[in-house]
Amino acid sequence: MSIPFSNTHYRIPQGFGNLLEGLTREILREQPDNIPAFAAAYFESLLEKREKTNFDPAEWGSKVEDRFYNNHAFEEQEPPEKSDPKQEESQIPGKEEEASVTILDSSEEDKEKEEVAAVKIQAAFRGHVAREEVKKMKTDSLQNEEKEENK
């Protein structure tokens, strides 16, 4: 006898979701034939890395997730600090120059990344269109052969 509509919620251990996300990402990236064996090898390699470097990705992920959901820094708005106008004037030009340089550098990098991504997307779409045309040509040729056989 089963209960079709249950309000039971299971608590997932902290970091477990991050481990499964990492495994899923690697499975999608590698496309293995034997997923359980791949998962075992993946978790074993994570254990080896944890022993060698004393870095636990599950623990790190749980801390990041906890910080994300429990960060109360932006709930209260602080008034801007008042300082001497002379100090502000001397500090602003240097900061503006640095900020503009980093913005330009990042925008150039972003443009390059966008161009590479656009080329990949266009190539994938062209490949898709070409495959559809080949599929259509095959079905047309099969239909023509069937018509010739029926005559």
Curated annotation (Swiss-Prot):
Gene3D superfamilies: 1.20.5.190, cAMP-dependent protein kinase regulatory subunit, dimerization-anchoring domain. Residues 68-98 have a biased composition (Basic and acidic residues). Residues 68-115, 130-151 are annotated as: Disordered. Residues 114-143 form the IQ domain. InterPro entries: cAMP_dep_PK_reg_su_I/II_a/b (IPR003117), DD_CABYR_SP17 (IPR047579), IQ_motif_EF-hand-BS (IPR000048), Sp17 (IPR012105). One of its GO terms (biological process) is binding of sperm to zona pellucida. It is a peripheral membrane protein. GO terms for molecular function: calmodulin binding. This is Sperm surface protein Sp17. The gene is SPA17.
